[in-house]
From Swiss-Prot:
Substrate binds at residue 167. Keywords: Calcium, Disulfide bond, Glycoprotein, Heme, Hydrogen peroxide, Iron, Metal-binding, Oxidoreductase, Peroxidase, Secreted, Signal. Coiled coil: none annotated. Its main location: secreted. This is Peroxidase 49. PROSITE patterns: PEROXIDASE_1, PEROXIDASE_2, PEROXIDASE_4. The record marks 66 as: Transition state stabilizer. Belongs to the peroxidase family. Classical plant (class III) peroxidase subfamily. It comes from the Eukaryota. GO terms for cellular component: extracellular region. Heme b binds at residue 197.
C-alpha cells in the first residue's frame, strides 16, 4: 500500500510539472487562467464589445491593435496610454505618435463598463487592451492566440517616453530596430509586428515627405513605385490635408493577411518605416519574403511576437492598481 501511495504521489508530481512550465513560459505571474474564478466571462465580454465596434467600423480593429502597441512601448503594458490629463498625469495621448491619431478609447470604455457590471474591480485596463488587440486580429481574419493575463494598471503616464520610445514613420531602419531592442524585441518581432499594417489607415502627414521631399532637397522618394506614388499625390497635397487617410495595404485593407509584405516587395509600402524593412537590411528583407510567400508562417510568428510584446514589463502582484475607470487613476 505504501508503494502504491508513493507511486501515485510521484505520478501526480510528474503530471504537474508541465502545468508549472506552461505558466512560467508565459512570463512570470501572467497566465491565461488568471481570471478563471474571479471573472470567467472576461474573454466573452471583451470579444462581444470589440465585435460590435469592428462591425460598425472595420478600421477600429487596427486602432485597437495600435493602442496596445503604443501602450506596451511606454512603461510596459500597463494601460498608461488610457489615462487622461489631470493634476497628476500628463497624458500620453498628447504625444506626437498619438495626438490626433490614437483612437478606440471609447471602445475600451465600453468594455470596461461591461466588465465592471459583471466583475467589479477585477479586470485591469491593461488586460482589456491586450485582449482587444487579439480579438481585433481574429475579427479581421488574422491569427488567434492564448493571452496571458494578470497585468495591473499604472498610476502614472510618461509623455516623454511616448515621444521617444514609439517608432516614427520617418525613422531609419536602425532607429526602429533599436527602439524594439530596448523593449526586448528582436528583428523577427519587428518584421512580424509591422505586419499588422495589413489593416488600417495612415494620415497624409505621416508619409507626405516620401511624395515631395524625402531627403530635404525637394525630391520624392524614388524607391516608391511610381504609379503608386502618383495615386498618393492625388490624395495627399503638398501642403494641407494632414488628416486625409490612405490605406496601409492597397491590396486588402480590411483583411488581416500577408499582402502587406507583398506590397513591400513591389515598393508599395505606404510609410517609410514599412518600406525600410525590405530595402535597408538583408535579414529583414528575407523575413519579408518569407511572410509574403507563407501566410501561415507570418500568422504563427505574429501571434508569438504579440504574446512577447504583451509581456513587456507588466505590473503584477501589489504593484499598480485595478482602475475602475480606464481614463483616471483610482482616488
Amino acid at each position: 500500500m505504501a508503494r502504491l501511495t508513493s507511486f501515485l504521489l510521484l505520478l501526480s508530481l510528474i503530471c504537474f510539472v508541465p502545468l508549472c512550465l506552461c505558466d512560467k513560459s508565459y512570463g512570470g505571474k501572467l497566465f491565461p487562467g488568471y481570471y478563471a474564478h474571479s471573472c470567467p466571462q472576461v474573454n466573452e465580454i471583451v470579444r462581444s464589445v470589440v465585435a460590435k465596434a469592428v462591425a460598425r467600423e472595420t478600421r477600429m480593429a487596427a486602432s485597437l491593435l495600435r493602442l496596445h502597441f503604443h501602450d506596451c512601448f511606454v512603461q510596459g503594458c500597463d494601460g498608461s496610454l488610457l489615462l487622461d490629463s489631470s493634476g497628476r498625469v500628463a497624458t500620453e495621448k498628447n504625444s506626437n505618435p498619438n495626438s490626433k491619431s490614437a483612437r478606440g478609447f471609447d471602445v475600451v470604455d465600453q468594455i470596461k463598463a461591461e466588465l465592471e457590471k459583471q466583475c467589479p474591480g477585477t479586470v485591469s485596463c491593461a488586460d482589456v487592451l491586450t485582449l482587444a488587440a487579439r480579438d481585433s486580429s481574429v475579427l479581421t481574419g488574422g491569427p488567434s492566440w492564448v493571452v496571458p493575463l494578470g497585468r495591473r494598471d499604472s498610476r502614472s503616464a510618461s509623455l516623454s517616453q511616448s515621444n521617444n520610445n514609439i517608432p516614427a514613420p520617418n525613422n531609419t531602419f536602425q532607429t526602429i530596430l533599436s527602439k524594439f531592442n530596448r523593449q526586448g524585441l528582436d528583428i523577427t518581432d519587428l518584421v512580424a509586428l509591422s505586419g499588422s499594417h495589413t489593416i488600417g489607415f495612415s494620415r497624409c502627414t505621416s508619409f507626405r515627405q516620401r511624395l515631395y521631399n524625402q531627403s530635404g532637397n525637394g525630391s520624392p522618394d524614388m524607391t516608391l513605385e511610381q504609379s503608386f506614388a502618383a495615386n498618393l499625390r492625388q490624395r495627399c497635397p503638398k501642403s494641407g490635408g494632414d488628416q486625409i487617410l490612405s490605406v496601409l495595404d492597397i491590396i486588402s485593407a480590411a483583411s488581416f493577411d500577408n499582402s502587406y509584405f507583398k506590397n513591400l516587395i513591389e515598393n508599395k509600402g505606404l510609410l517609410n518605416s514599412d518600406q525600410v524593412l525590405f530595402s535597408s537590411n538583408e535579414k529583414s528583407r528575407e523575413l519579408v519574403k518569407k511572410y509574403a510567400e507563407d501566410q501561415g508562417e507570418f500568422f504563427e510568428q505574429f501571434a508569438e511576437s504579440m504574446i512577447k510584446m504583451g509581456n513587456i514589463s507588466p505590473l503584477t502582484g501589489s504593484s499598480g492598481e485595478i482602475r475602475k475607470n480606464c481614463r483616471k487613476i483610482n482616488s
